[in-house]
Design a protein with these regions (language model features):
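A carboxyl-terminal module marker
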Residues: 6-12, 18-30, 37-222
Length: 222
């Protein structure tokens, strides 16, 4: 599923009381949604689309469990160069109920000023790829404390320059996965700039990725 950012965003100032009695008024970009087809991963995709649109290519995500406004198992902060630029996830059910809402609500809050400071350089013309991409899906089982960001970083380092995109599409806990573990699934897009990749080359790259995941993070193919 894809989220239509155009219909579900707001840009405005928020107000925070300081100890000196004055107020901070940062400008915040909020994106939200609920209903069928809306979940954590759809929202993450919307956040990533925003970052991509202003050419922020090195953002990371870190799980958050202590933000009282959000579900402790479905919340992440957005980091750019080690600085927090926003947070997103499922609104805590108790918070939603306080406003008379029973549905699962999802929201992202991004600091507009931080986004502008972090945005990348103006784009340069890049010709369309001459050669087709090869896609592979992988699902690995790892410990609960292993973050998605750590897995993504390991995948990028293991792919030897052929990886063009890595996209998280599922996190599963339950039957078939040991207690204290989780299954995390990614879609990998691989492409060479000078030739068409063979299935054998793509499989070799994925094998290298899986070996590094197991070596560094103890994550094994499901």
């Amino acid at each position: 599923s894809e989220m239509c950012i155009r219909d579900r965003y707001e840009l405005g100032r928020t107000y925070f009381q300081r100890e000196d009695g004055m107020a901070d008024e940062p400008k915040v970009l909020s994106v939200g949604g609920y209903g069928d087809g809306m979940d954590f991963f759809v929202l993450k995709g919307a956040v990533q689309s925003i970052l991509d649109s202003i050419r922020i290519s090195d953002a990371g995500y870190e799980a958050v469990r202590d933000n009282p406004s959000y579900h402790p198992g479905r919340c992440a902060r957005i980091l750019v160069d080690g600085r927090e630029v926003g947070v997103f996830g499922q609104i805590h059910p108790l918070v939603a109920q306080n406003y008379g809402v029973d549905a699962e609500l999802y929201c992202a809050e991004l600091s507009f000023d931080e986004l502008l400071n972090a945005k990348g350089p103006d784009p340069e013309y890049v010709p369309l790829p001459r050669f087709p991409a090869v896609t592979r899906d992988i699902a690995v089982v790892c410990g609960e404390k292993v973050t998605v960001g750590a897995l993504e970083d390991c995948i990028r380092r293991g792919a030897k320059g052929l990886l063009k995109e890595v996209a998280l599409f599922d996190i599963y806990r339950g039957k078939g996965v040991d207690e204290g573990k989780k299954s995390v699934a990614f879609n990998l897009t691989l492409r060479a700039d000078d030739r068409s990749l063979t299935s054998e080359e793509a499989d070799a790259d994925v094998k290298a990725v899986l070996e590094l995941l197991e070596q560094e993070l103890g994550a094994v193919l499901r």
